[in-house]
């Protein structure tokens, strides 16, 4: 049983919802990024989404765009991003790790080499935000053949016909984008999301995770109540940004502030 399936089954058996955290690899630098990522599991995180920095992140709002810029400026590459996963696995072999990003860096790296290296280093799933289901056959087939979960995005504007097409080949979990537009710029209404999720649940048995627009512990609790889990990204990255010094470098409070905020979300979801 792969890590994603095992994690969601264990959480379901314990009547809990999954907390996923998104962080850009190498933001604000490789060492700080790695320290935060390796400390996520003991701070209540159930799965990790690692953003692969890209110079043109069109689906992301200012927060994640700036995060990518800081990471690239610090020297982060896709190769180093994969090495971060390898280093996390040296300390934790249980938590699911999903890479999230854009197709261009994967294409430049080499699709087969990317999948091979990702699996070798301990990646469990892949989310490619700018690769439509109609155009991802080669990367999808190679990923699925090698047991790398290909996680699909569904948005509020996805119609029923397209929804069935997307779900047909989905694996791992379903990532529901709760807002239209770019990341981190607005929040979704619980009732609207709940109706959409009810429609999706009729067509798949995969866990459904809500992302985009979750910024507070209260929102995390509310959204997790209607889903199998949630992802918090921009709000965590904003916490990192707020702790940086005048040179946009990590300060003595960066790691602590970030993990403290994540713990607040986790505790709220666990009713602690």
For the regions a protein language model found, what residue spans apply to each?
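Conserved N-terminal beta1-alpha1 strand-loop-helix module at the mouth
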Residues: 1-94, 108-111, 168, 251-257, ...
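Active-site-adjacent beta->alpha loops and helix N-cap segments on the catalytic face
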Residues: 1-11, 56-66, 76-88, 106-113, ...
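Hydrophobic faces of well-ordered beta-strands that scaffold small-molecule active sites
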Residues: 19-23, 48-50, 97-101, 126-128, ...
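Catalytic cores of alpha/beta
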Residues: 30-40, 158-168, 210, 214-230
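Glycine-rich phosphate-binding active-site loops on the catalytic face of alpha/beta enzymes
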Residues: 45-56, 125-127, 176-184, 213, ...
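Alpha-helix-loop-beta-strand connector modules within alpha/beta enzyme cores
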Residues: 63-98, 141-151, 155, 192-208, ...
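Active-site/ligand-binding-proximal alpha/beta "capping" segment
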Residues: 113-116, 175-180, 184-229
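Alpha/beta catalytic cores of nucleotide-metabolism and tRNA/nucleoside-modifying enzymes
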Residues: 198-204, 215-272
């Amino acid at each position: 049983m792969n890590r994603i399936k095992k994690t969601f089954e264990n959480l379901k058996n314990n009547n809990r919802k999954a907390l996923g955290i998104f962080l850009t690899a190498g933001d604000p630098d490789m060492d700080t990024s790695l320290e935060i990522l390796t400390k996520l599991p003991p701070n209540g995180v159930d799965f990790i989404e690692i953003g692969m920095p890209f110079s043109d992140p069109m689906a992301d709002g200012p927060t994640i765009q700036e995060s990518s810029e800081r990471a690239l400026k610090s020297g982060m590459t896709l190769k180093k991003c994969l090495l971060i996963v390898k280093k996390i696995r040296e300390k934790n072999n249980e938590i699911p790790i999903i890479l999230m990003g854009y197709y261009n860096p994967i294409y430049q790296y080499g699709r087969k080499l990317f999948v091979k290296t990702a699996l070798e280093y301990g990646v469990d799933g892949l989310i490619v935000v700018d690769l439509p289901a109609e155009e991802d056959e080669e990367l999808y087939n190679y990923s699925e053949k090698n047991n790398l979960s290909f996680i699909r995005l569904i948005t509020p504007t996805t119609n029923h016909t397209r929804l069935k097409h997307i779900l047909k080949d989905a694996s791992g979990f379903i990532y529901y984008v709760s807002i239209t537009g770019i990341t981190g710029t607005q929040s979704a209404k619980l009732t609207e999301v709940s109706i959409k999720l009810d429609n999706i649940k009729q067509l798949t048995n995969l866990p459904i995770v809500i992302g985009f627009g979750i910024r507070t512990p209260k929102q995390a609790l509310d959204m997790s109540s209607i889903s199998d889990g949630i992802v918090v990204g921009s709000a965590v990255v904003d916490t990192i940004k707020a702790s940086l010094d005048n040179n946009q470098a990590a300060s003595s409070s960066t790691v602590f502030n970030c993990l403290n905020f994540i713990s607040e979300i986790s505790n709220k979801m666990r009713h602690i």
